[in-house]
């Protein structure tokens, strides 16, 4: 007769959490920063096609670290949720808070019921008419949700990157300064006391939620992805 081994619920949840954290820690960091011009999303990502940052709806964007197939399925589900809700009710009823709640439920259900948790960490950002109306939500692998202010940092080096950004963040930052600040934080720590080498433009992914998209471009869609030339010009 095969002997049954008992694993306490506490140990099971701890093992699941440790497993997810290890997977996330292997991922390169992502930074989401609220600034005067809107919200800047910056990721260390050498792939030109496998995006860590994406558009969800008019003024809502998504950023993630971890396993690509897992967070991409969540991004697509978020787009479907937003489209259906906006069509069934009103476009103004699609909010970052509502989307974050849906993601929290999905992540929590997978964490407790499936064989393995998702190895992902998400950020949902919504740009407002003013900086005070910006919304930043951070979601972890177990469905925990946090309402963040000013900026969100995710990934294996999150603490180091967050510390660097916290020292330089201010409400008056424009898009160029916000992206520079994010890149300075993402730059690998130097092995000596020399200045850290910046991340090259071809190895980063940058997008913005433009606070003034309706005024400048006449479009409700605030999301805009920057190519290498745009990034170089922005940082010039």
UniProtKB/Swiss-Prot annotation:
**Biological role:** Component of the proteasome core, a large protease complex with broad specificity involved in protein degradation.
- Cytoplasm as a keyword of this entry, yes or no, is yes
The gene it comes from is prcA
Similarity comment: family membership = Belongs to the peptidase T1A family.
Report the activity regulation comment. The formation of the proteasomal ATPase ARC-20S proteasome complex, likely via the docking of the C-termini of ARC into the intersubunit pockets in the alpha-rings, may trigger opening of the gate for substrate entry. Interconversion between the open-gate and close-gate conformations leads to a dynamic regulation of the 20S proteasome proteolysis activity.
BP-aspect Gene Ontology terms: modification-dependent protein catabolic process; proteasomal protein catabolic process
| InterPro entries assigned to the protein according to its UniProt record, in alphabetical order | Ntn_hydrolases_N (IPR029055), Proteasome_alpha-type (IPR023332), Proteasome_asu_bac (IPR022296), Proteasome_sua/b (IPR001353)
Matches recorded under Pfam families: Proteasome
Quaternary context: The 20S proteasome core is composed of 14 alpha and 14 beta subunits that assemble into four stacked heptameric rings, resulting in a barrel-shaped structure. The two inner rings, each composed of seven catalytic beta subunits, are sandwiched by two outer rings, each composed of seven alpha subunits. The catalytic chamber with the active sites is on the inside of the barrel. Has a gated structure, the ends of the cylinder being occluded by the N-termini of the alpha-subunits. Is capped by the proteasome-associated ATPase, ARC.
Q: In which pathway does it act?
A: Protein degradation; proteasomal Pup-dependent pathway
Q: Does the keyword Cytoplasm apply?
A: yes
Name of the protein: Proteasome subunit alpha
Question: Domain of life here?
Answer: Bacteria
Q: Name one GO molecular function term.
A: threonine-type endopeptidase activity
Keywords annotated in UniProt: Cytoplasm, Proteasome
Of the GO CC terms on this record, one is: proteasome core complex, alpha-subunit complex
Q: Where in the cell is it found?
A: Cytoplasm
């Amino acid at each position: 007769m095969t002997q049954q081994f008992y694993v306490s619920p506490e140990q099971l949840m701890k093992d699941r959490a440790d497993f997810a954290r290890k997977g996330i820690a292997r991922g390169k960091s992502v930074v989401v920063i609220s600034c005067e011009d809107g919200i800047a999303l910056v990721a260390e990502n050498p792939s030109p096609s496998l995006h860590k940052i994406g558009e969800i709806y008019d003024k809502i964007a998504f950023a993630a670290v971890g396993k690509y197939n897992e967070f991409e399925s969540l991004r697509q589900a978020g787009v479907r949720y937003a489209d259906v809700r906006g069509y069934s009710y009103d476009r103004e009823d699609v909010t970052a808070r509502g989307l974050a709640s849906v993601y929290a439920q999905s992540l929590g259900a997978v964490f407790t019921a499936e064989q393995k948790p998702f190895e992902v960490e998400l950020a949902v950002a919504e740009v407002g008419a003013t900086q005070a109306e910006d919304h930043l939500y951070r979601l972890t692998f177990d469905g925990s949700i946090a309402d963040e202010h000013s900026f969100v940092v995710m990934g294996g080096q999150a603490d180091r990157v967050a510390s660097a950004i916290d020292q330089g963040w201010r409400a008056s930052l424009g898009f160029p300064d916000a992206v520079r600040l994010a890149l300075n934080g993402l730059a690998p720590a130097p092995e000596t006391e020399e200045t850290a080498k910046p991340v090259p433009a071809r190895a980063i992914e940058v997008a913005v939620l433009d606070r003034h998209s309706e005024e400048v471009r006449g479009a409700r869609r605030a999301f805009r992805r920057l190519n290498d030339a745009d990034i170089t010009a922005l940082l010039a």
